[in-house]
Regions:
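Internal helical hairpin/lid segments
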Residues: 187-190
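Short active-site oxyanion
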Residues: 64-66, 90-95, 165-166
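N-terminal glycine-rich "phosphate-gripper" loop used for MgATP/nucleotide binding
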Residues: 66-77, 98
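Conserved active-site and cofactor/substrate-binding residues in soluble primary-metabolism enzymes
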Residues: 11-14, 18, 50-53, 74, ...
Length: 190
């Protein structure tokens, strides 16, 4: 089951019914958290306590296999200190999102060792193309090695010849900067 949470901004320009219909057309069962249907102060999907609790609840829910964020926006750095990371560490699941979700991706990696999926979000499911969906499935189902490729019409340019090894970590630069000097900051050593 795909659990959808809204740890940042509220839903805009689509409906939960449309999102559910589109995700089900890809074969997913869908469960929405409380925050998905909330709008708090016009720019948050619920108050900080609700959004933090929704994250914990989805990690605790044994029926949920994958957690995908509804959308980005603003607000994840407000809830980083409200999350019980032991819950997440003891119930690891793929966690997908980008933009403002970078704050959670960094915190989950730093505190729980969970490798985040910097990827598509549920509010955009109606705009997914075949390449996007195939990339999501490949990332979620890989066994040994994940092979990344660009769309055929997008050429890959090599900036520097050679090989590199390490952990690739990134996301929204403003969120990476916002976590610098905190316990959620990227360890860029490796």
């Amino acid at each position: 089951m795909l659990g959808i949470i809204a740890p940042s901004g509220p839903l805009r320009n689509t409906s939960l019914e449309e999102i559910k219909f589109n995700l089900e057309s890809y074969g997913y069962e869908v469960k929405f958290s409380e925050s998905c249907s909330l709008n708090y102060k016009g720019y948050l999907a619920g108050n900080d306590d609700i959004r933090a609790r929704d994250i914990e609840d989805m990690f605790l829910d044994k029926d949920v296999d994958i957690i995908m964020c509804l959308r980005g926006g603003y607000g994840t750095t407000r809830i980083l200190d409200k999350i019980n990371y032991d819950i997440i560490k003891q119930n690891p699941k793929p966690f997908i999102g980008f933009s403002d979700i970078t704050g959670l991706n960094l915190a989950f990696y730093k505190n729980c060792g969970i490798l985040p999926y910097h990827g598509i979000m549920a509010a955009n499911v109606g705009k997914w193309d075949k390449f996007t969906y195939k990339s999501l499935v490949n990332a979620l189902e890989f066994k040994d090695e994940l092979y990344l490729e660009n769309p055929k019409e997008e050429k890959i340019y090599t900036v520097c010849e050679g090989k590199a090894e390490g952990i690739i970590m990134g996301g929204n630069l403003s969120l990476i900067i916002a976590t610098m000097g905190t316990k959620y900051e990227i360890d860029a050593k490796d």
